[in-house]
C-alpha cells in the first residue's frame, strides 16, 4: 500500500522482520540494539569433489565448523562454515550493540575471516555467488498481540540462539 491507498482488515498479522515497525507503532515493543545480532553470510561456489577433499568428506556427507574469538575481534558472536553440495556457506554473527561500540564495520569482519589462512585454504578458487545479511532477534517479545494485531516470526522474537544453533523455523511451523 502506498500513497493515499488504504487497506482495512479485522486482524493484521505482522511478519515484518526482527525490527517490526508494526509492533513498535502498536506499542508492543520499543527496540534496543542490545536485543539484536547481525548475521552476514557469503555463499562460495566450489565443485563438489573439491569440497569433499578439503573437508575430508565421503559423497553425500556434510560438515559444519563453528568459530569464536579472533574471528569477531572478540565481539560477542561467532563465525561458521557449512558445506553444501556445490558451495560453502560462510558467515559471521555478532551483537549489534557490541559492533557499534567497537567501531568496527561489519563487512570488515567477514573479510578478515575469509583471509584467515585456515579459511583461505577452504575457499581457495571459489567464487562468491551470494552475499546476504539479516537482523536476528536475541530477545523474545512479551506482547505478541493487541486488538487487531498478531506479531509472528522474527517480528515476535521467536528464535532461540543457543550459541551453536539458531532455531526459528520449527517455531514458525508449529
Residue ranges and their predicted role:
Residues 1-124, 158:
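Predominantly flavin-linked oxidoreductase catalytic cores and closely associated redox partners
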Amino acid at each position: 500500500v502506498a500513497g493515499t491507498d488504504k487497506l482495512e482488515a479485522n486482524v493484521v498479522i505482522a511478519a515484518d522482520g526482527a525490527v517490526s515497525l508494526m509492533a513498535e507503532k502498536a506499542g508492543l515493543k520499543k527496540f534496543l540494539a542490545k536485543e539484536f545480532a547481525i548475521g552476514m553470510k557469503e555463499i562460495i561456489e566450489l565443485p563438489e569433489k573439491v569440497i569433499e577433499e578439503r573437508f575430508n568428506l565421503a559423497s553425500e556427507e556434510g560438515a559444519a565448523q563453528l568459530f569464536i574469538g579472533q574471528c569477531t575481534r572478540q565481539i560477542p558472536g561467532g563465525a561458521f562454515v557449512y558445506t553444501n553440495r556445490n558451495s560453502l556457506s560462510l558467515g559471521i554473527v555478532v551483537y549489534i550493540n557490541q559492533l557499534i561500540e567497537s567501531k568496527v564495520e561489519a563487512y570488515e569482519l567477514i573479510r578478515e575471516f575469509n583471509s584467515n589462512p585456515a579459511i583461505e585454504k577452504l575457499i581457495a578458487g571459489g567464487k562468491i555467488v551470494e552475499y546476504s545479511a539479516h537482523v536476528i532477534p536475541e530477545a523474545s517479545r512479551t506482547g505478541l498481540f493487541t486488538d487487531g494485531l498478531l506479531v509472528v516470526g522474527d517480528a515476535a522474537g521467536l528464535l532461540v540462539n543457543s550459541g551453536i544453533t539458531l532455531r526459528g523455523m520449527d517455531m514458525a511451523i508449529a
